Swiss-Prot record:
It comes from the Bacteria. Its main location: cytoplasm. GO terms for cellular component: cytoplasm. One of its GO terms (biological process) is heme biosynthetic process. Coiled coil: none annotated. It comes from Salmonella paratyphi A (strain AKU_12601). InterPro entries: Ferrochelatase, Ferrochelatase_AS, Ferrochelatase_C, Ferrochelatase_N. It is found in: Cytoplasm. NCBIfam families: hemH (TIGR00109). GO terms for molecular function: ferrochelatase activity; metal ion binding. It is an enzyme of class 4 (lyase). Transmembrane segments: none annotated. This is Ferrochelatase. HAMAP family: Ferrochelatase.
Amino acid sequence: MRQTKTGILLANLGTPDAPTPEAVKRYLKQFLSDRRVVDTPRLLWWPLLRGVILPLRSPRVAKLYQSIWMDGGSPLMVYSREQQQALAARLPDTPVALGMSYGSPSLESAVDELLASDVDHIVVLPLYPQYSCSTVGAVWDELGRILARKRRIPGISFIRDYADDGAYIDALAKSARESFARHGEPDVLLLSYHGIPQRYADEGDDYPQRCRDTTRELVSALGLPPEKVMMTFQSRFGREPWLTPYTDETLKMLGEKGTGHIQVMCPGFAADCLETLEEIAEQNREIFLEVGGKKYAYIPALNATPEHIDMMLKLTAPYR
């Protein structure tokens, strides 16, 4: 009997190919066209997206990308490639592919790469620690569309999320402790998660609960008093209410109240990207310092640290 050959697909959101208005426009068009991300009726959404949002946002977002672009590309792509390579090095007999929901390399190219390696079972690990319909759900949808076009469909193991996984919490706690050792223990540790529309949660998305699960376990692992840790939500888009409290408004409030030392961690981001390196490490730093805050430090994402790769090994082990 032929032994099953398993491959691993690491999935993440994606990134523009270049920090230019044209590349950003292509990326945003694909991203904001996904009904999992924006579910506004298409008759209303298409004219707004194509006539207003893309022309106005693309040049501005391109400038933000230019401020963080690395020699090897966007930070998300650089760190995602490092994750793929590090995991592959630990699993020499298991093909590991990287696929993005939007942009390249696509999820379809990752599936094709694994099938070309003659795998008959794929472990899909979306690198979103906390499930949301707009992230993990989008990977699930696209995977279904891809496999619907294939004559040979492999077995699939799909890891929904890992918000309270012990190895994940341990990796976050180690990262936080290293930051405390470097900068001193903060007055407040702010855990900033990407937001989603409040309506999505009202309709059943358990993302807020999974964020609370991560926060609870991390506070316990660090042994911090609960009053020294705050959970907030960032990166809201559009006019409808999103999950609260908002990160930027919370930092402004803390600075105005005289909180001197803040450290910010973004547990929901597996790799540093525009939302962490520019929005949190730069924009939100300015918000806090401008209203009287004294010390602000951003704690980097887990990226390709050994502890993060250990976590990936643990999560995928039952399916390999």
